[in-house]
Regions:
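Sec-dependent N-terminal signal peptides
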Residues: 20-24
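Ser/Thr-glycine-rich phosphate-binding loops at phosphate-binding pockets of nucleotides
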Residues: 286, 290-291
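C-terminal motif of bacterial Sec signal peptides marking the signal peptidase cleavage site
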Residues: 27-31
């Protein structure tokens, strides 16, 4: 995969004394106390005027643990990484202000048309920012007393792990490079566990967290791979009444080849082909078996390598350690090999179109939605 980068952090006390105003994006996604992570290297700061210091971004900023990055880069096996704890790392912007307050703006666009704003309070020394994209250039702007300071930084390429209160096994399926040199877009499909606590009461998205989740992700569809039998009567997505929802009773692993699951798969891929259903949250109960199977087929038809497909599946080992080493997908790959095609992508597409009933137009729509 990609070149290795170090985690960075501004937690050195000596440096804090220098940051008199806005280390206007002391964006050290990897370091900070949210996950009990040790601080590491320091970005040097530059004083731009009296009372104002800004970071100089000499390296990319890491949004995951060192071990998770090593897994991504092919330097460490996932089974050796899962014991190190959660792979997610927030971005922490540390600062000191000699004014009462300031504003930090972050955007992927240099015009700041879609900027997210964060208040900087003189009584605090940091603001934590969750769920930025990996492998992405960000523009930042800090405003204090009518003066603006701006710059850019880039996040390191890695798996994009997601943090949502009360929910686990979350990640963006985007960011992967395909075998033909394209990239799966981030921000379109987040995979995870159930949100309603029906099977596991610990997995529950609380009412007070819904607005923040929607501000970040803007989900319009809840693709629920569970059976409708888990609940009685009308069902509403925890993501909000305005969010579309459907149960699919999806298969797991080699069940995808059983005739009784063909209609379920056909409906799933028909909805994955609908551009109006994105951004989408895709899940089952644990975000493991049914979700892992559907994501494998989806990323496979997008031409992700078999090695990366297995890595994406086994990242669930951070929540369920046994998944980091299990071989349940081997039967899936073996049976897909019986279908016409010189590549795994061709075999998956032929299976979906000739057996499941997914149309070629739907395949092309999915590829158009996800690839850049």
């Amino acid at each position: 995969m990609k070149e290795k980068r170090k985690c960075e952090c501004f937690s050195n006390p000596a440096v804090r004394g220098i940051l008199i105003a806005l280390v206007a994006v002391c964006l050290i996604f990897s370091g900070c106390e949210k996950a009990g992570v040790d601080d590491s290297a320091i970005n040097p700061t530059v004083t731009v005027e009296e009372g104002v210091a800004l970071p100089r971004f000499e390296q990319e900023v890491l949004l995951c643990s060192d071990e998770a990055k090593q897994v991504y880069d092919g330097e460490l096996k996932i089974e050796n990484a899962v014991a190190t704890g959660t792979p997610y790392r927030p971005f922490v912007f540390e600062y000191q202000l000699d004014q009462a307050s300031g504003i930090l703006r972050l955007s992927e666009d240099s015009s700041f048309a879609d900027a997210q704003e964060y208040n900087l309070d003189q009584s605090k020394t940091s603001v934590m920012i969750d769920n930025l994209k990996t492998g992405t250039t960000y523009h930042y702007q800090v405003e204090v007393s009518g003066k603006q300071y701006s710059g850019t930084f880039r996040t390191a390429s890695s798996n994009r792990f997601i943090s949502i209160p009360g929910v686990e096994n979350l990640r963006d399926i985007g960011g992967y490079k395909t075998l033909d040199g394209k990239t799966i877009k981030q921000g379109l499909l987040i995979r995870g566990c159930e949100l309603d606590g029906i099977k596991n009461e610990d997995y529950f998205l609380a009412d007070q967290d819904v607005a923040a989740v929607q501000k970040t992700f803007g989900f319009v569809y809840d693709l629920d791979l569970r059976s409708p039998e888990i609940t009685e009567g009308d069902y509403q997505s925890r993501l909000g009444a305005q969010v579309g929802h459907q149960f699919y009773d999806a298969p797991t692993y080699a069940q995808i080849f059983r005739p009784e699951y063909q209609d379920s798969l056909r409906r799933i891929f028909a909805d994955l082909a609908d551009p109006d259903k994105y951004p989408m949250y895709l899940h089952c109960t644990w975000g493991r078996d049914r979700t892992g199977t559907v994501v494998l087929l989806l990323q496979g038809l997008l031409n992700v390598s078999q090695e990366d497909l297995m890595q994406e599946y086994r990242l669930t080992g951070y929540v369920t350690p046994a998944v980091a080493t299990n071989n349940k997908m081997d039967t899936v790959f073996m049976q897909l090999g019986a279908y016409e095609g010189d590549t795994l992508q061709e075999q998956i597409i032929n299976y979906l179109t000739t057996v499941v009933g997914v149309t070629q137009e739907e395949i092309e729509s999915i590829q158009s939605i996800f690839l850049e």
